[in-house]
């Protein structure tokens, strides 16, 4: 499985999360994952909630359409974006 996989209308993305960063951003490829930096600390699910909010803005979709499938408690995550309205350029170039 690559960094980004398209399944019907959804995208499945493997992420490496950098919490407590200076700003929210999609950094780029990181091995076989996509590195995403977020400002929230990894405490009490704050980083996951912030990640979902940030990605929802990037894909112009509702927060409920960003699902963490694997890695709820770690830096390595697999997320599903349900029917994104827009795909950020940093991610669209990684779609096979």
UniProtKB/Swiss-Prot annotation:
GO cellular component, one term: cytoplasm
InterPro entries per record: DUF167, YggU-like_sf
Highest taxon above the source species: Bacteria
PANTHER family linked to this entry: UPF0235 PROTEIN C15ORF40 (PTHR13420:SF7)
Family: Belongs to the UPF0235 family.
Record's protein name: UPF0235 protein Shew_1134
């Amino acid at each position: 499985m690559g960094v980004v996989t398209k399944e019907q209308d959804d995208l499945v993305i493997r992420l490496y999360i950098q919490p407590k960063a200076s700003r929210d951003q999609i950094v780029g490829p990181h091995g076989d994952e996509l590195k995403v930096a977020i400002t929230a600390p990894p405490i009490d699910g704050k980083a996951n909630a912030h990640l979902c909010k940030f990605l929802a803005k990037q894909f112009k979709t509702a927060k409920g359409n960003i699902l963490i499938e694997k890695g709820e408690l770690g830096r390595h995550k697999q997320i599903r974006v349900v029917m994104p309205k827009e795909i950020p350029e940093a991610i669209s170039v990684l779609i096979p």
